């Protein structure tokens, strides 16, 4: 009897406090774009309008939706894909025990029930990538959906994709995903890495991490599983993921050859790409820029090659003394990608793993190759983003962004941090968020989160929450710095609520309402404290905002401007000082 994963096995979260799921109708039939609407209380009888924010949580936070993990999410994009008339269903490759890293399938592995689903691919001679449509002047349903989410015109979305400045990762076999866009002229996005390892985690835990990450604001998920049940874990995640899912296919390919890098072949890797494309993976990290001639340059580094995918390919190249087969077969990879609309995330296999190695010859040599590969992918109308570092001190961060834009012709940059110092294990979500905010401001389109467990262990769901929130802060700070037209609205609303002592509105407007309320209630748990004009930091007599209110009230009572009120009050105090004998201490 095959086991299953059910909603009862994981902790599912409802909508955040003070929020409700709302939908904006598109022009296309059945198109409903989700938003999160945050209610606000009145100020002295004057209504404060609700604030609508971008929502990545999927149907899990819709009270009308019944979660059935074994059935997967609904698939609204399926009809859009079929409606274009350029795809066909086919049998697909046979799923084998080796796909899960075993020789014989285990009865204890919870296989996803809907295994009779037929994958889609482009018809002979067709190209189903969003870039191909965009370059042919077509505004797809996915582009309109994204435009509503971002608050821009659909034509702007089409043009950014056509020019290669943005990608819309949307594999035709992942119809459950709600379309989103990654590009420097849109909201800065956040990716959350999940996935098992050889020593930790189960399928249920990884599905739970996915739902947690998207609830807290992850725009995409990467399944970086390296343990057993790789295929099955990915199937459960994709079928239940409302956001795009990325992978590093070389990890699974390595499992298929028993973890021996030198036994990897193009045929094994190609088979893995097709397997994952049929499942619905939206973007592949492919380390095609790790060339044989670059590997010796890393020998003088402090920390060598720190990318798992990069080190695997380097080991293969050195053993065979041949060029990286991902590079030599790159055009063939493009042919696969455009059949399913899988986007490239060109991997930075030679990224710096320490401050000492930042911006070195190996890193920027690989970047030059990624620029070359970007042009090849674009020749096939395949969408591309570029992965970036890594460990970079603050004064060297801007150079990374400038070089990427120049060398890779403006393709979206997707960076891991970067970490700005190496001395804070346990706090690397903070060291990296500093760099993430900076590089997001300079133009990075998506930030890959770092959790407190970075360099220490596999993150659990609480670490995922911590990492996502930390990176949402960095991404939002970057949006503010870039002058995104709607970014300041939530800040202004929260600041107004703070000044007016609307405590619940403060909590609800924050990125993590539950944490904000928890910290407030540690010292002032009573319900009356939710309307008090002070908190436990300053108390009632030293609250600067309460004093500001007193000044304004004084000005109002005396028919004065606030500055005049302060001057008048100072004069009154001066007279009082003289009348009491001009003594400093009584």
Swiss-Prot record:
It comes from the Bacteria. Pathway: Cofactor biosynthesis; thiamine diphosphate biosynthesis. One of its GO terms (biological process) is thiamine biosynthetic process. It catalyses: 5-amino-1-(5-phospho-beta-D-ribosyl)imidazole + S-adenosyl-L-methionine = 4-amino-2-methyl-5-(phosphooxymethyl)pyrimidine + CO + 5'-deoxyadenosine + formate + L-methionine + 3 H(+). Residues 1-58 are annotated as: Disordered. Its cofactor is [4Fe-4S] cluster. It holds the Pfam family ThiC-associated. Substrate binds at residues 193, 222, 251, 287, 307-309, 348-351, 387, 414. Keywords: 4Fe-4S, Iron, Iron-sulfur, Lyase, Metal-binding, S-adenosyl-L-methionine, Thiamine biosynthesis, Zinc. [4Fe-4S] cluster binds at residues 535, 538, 543. Gene3D superfamilies: 6.10.250.620, Radical SAM ThiC family, central domain (3.20.20.540). Zn(2+) binds at residues 391, 455. Its EC number is 4.1.99.17. GO terms for cellular component: cytosol. It is an enzyme of class 4 (lyase). Binds 1 [4Fe-4S] cluster per subunit. The cluster is coordinated with 3 cysteines and an exchangeable S-adenosyl-L-methionine. One of its GO terms (molecular function) is 4 iron, 4 sulfur cluster binding. Catalyzes the synthesis of the hydroxymethylpyrimidine phosphate (HMP-P) moiety of thiamine from aminoimidazole ribotide (AIR) in a radical S-adenosyl-L-methionine (SAM)-dependent reaction. Belongs to the ThiC family. This is Phosphomethylpyrimidine synthase. It comes from Bacillus mycoides (strain KBAB4). The gene is thiC.
């Amino acid at each position: 009897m095959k086991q299953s994963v059910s909603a009862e096995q994981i902790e599912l979260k409802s909508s955040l406090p003070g929020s409700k799921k709302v939908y904006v109708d598109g022009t296309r039939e059945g198109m409903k774009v989700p938003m999160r609407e945050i209610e606000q209380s009145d100020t002295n009888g004057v209504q404060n309008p609700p604030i609508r924010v971008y929502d990545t949580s999927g149907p899990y936070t819709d009270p009308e939706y019944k979660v059935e993990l074994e059935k997967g999410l609904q698939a609204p994009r399926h009809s859009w894909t079929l409606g274009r008339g350029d795809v066909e269903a086919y049998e697909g490759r046979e799923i084998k025990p080796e796909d899960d890293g075993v020789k014989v399938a285990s009865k204890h592995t919870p296989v996803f029930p809907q295994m009779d689903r037929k994958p889609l691919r482009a018809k002979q001679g067709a190209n189903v990538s969003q870039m191909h449509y965009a370059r042919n002047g077509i505004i797809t349903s996915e582009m309109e959906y994204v435009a509503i989410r971002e608050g821009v015109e659909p034509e702007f979305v089409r043009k950014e994709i056509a020019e290669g400045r943005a990608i819309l990762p949307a594999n035709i076999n992942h119809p459950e995903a709600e379309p989103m866009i990654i590009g420097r002229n849109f909201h800065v996005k956040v990716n959350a890495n999940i996935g098992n390892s050889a020593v930790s985690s189960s399928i249920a835990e990884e599905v739970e991490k996915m739902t947690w990450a998207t609830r807290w604001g992850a725009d995409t998920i990467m399944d970086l599983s390296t343990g057993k049940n790789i295929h099955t874990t990915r199937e459960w995640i994709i079928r239940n993921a409302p956001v795009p899912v990325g992978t590093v296919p070389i990890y699974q390919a390595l499992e298929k050859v028993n973890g021996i890098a030198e036994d990897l072949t193009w045929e094994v890797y190609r088979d893995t790409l097709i397997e994952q494309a049929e499942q619905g993976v939206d973007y592949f990290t492919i380390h095609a820029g790790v060339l044989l001639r670059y590997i010796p340059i890393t020998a003088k580094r402090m920390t060598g090659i720190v990318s798992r995918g990069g080190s695997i390919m380097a080991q293969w190249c050195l053993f065979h003394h041949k060029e990286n087969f991902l590079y030599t077969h790159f055009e063939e990879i493009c042919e696969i990608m455009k059949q399913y609309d899988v986007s490239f995330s060109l991997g930075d296999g030679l990224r710096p793993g320490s401050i000492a190695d930042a911006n070195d010859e190996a890193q920027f040599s690989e970047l030059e190759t990624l620029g070359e590969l970007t042009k090849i992918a674009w020749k096939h109308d395949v969408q591309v983003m570029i992965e970036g570092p890594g460990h970079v001190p603050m004064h060297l961060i801007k150079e990374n962004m400038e070089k990427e834009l120049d060398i890779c012709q403006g393709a979206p940059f997707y960076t891991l941090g970067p970490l700005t110092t190496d001395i804070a294990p346990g706090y690397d979500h903070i060291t990296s968020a500093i760099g993430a905010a900076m590089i997001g401001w300079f133009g990075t389109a998506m930030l890959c989160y770092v959790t407190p467990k970075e360099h220490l262990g596999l993150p659990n769901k609480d670490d995922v929450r911590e990492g996502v929130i930390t990176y949402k802060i960095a991404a939002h700070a970057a949006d503010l710095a870039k002058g995104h037209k709607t970014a300041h609205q939530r800040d202004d609303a929260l600041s107004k609520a703070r000044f007016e002592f609307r405590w619940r509105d403060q909590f609800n407007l924050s990125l993590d309402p539950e944490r904000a309320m928890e910290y407030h209630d540690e010292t002032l748990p009573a319900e009356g404290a939710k309307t008090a004009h002070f908190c436990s930091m300053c108390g009632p007599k030293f609250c600067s905002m309460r004093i500001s209110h007193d000044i304004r009230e004084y000005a109002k009572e005396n028919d004065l401007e606030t500055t005049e009120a302060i001057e008048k009050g100072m004069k009154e105090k001066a007279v009082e000082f003289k009348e009491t004998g001009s003594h400093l201490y009584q």
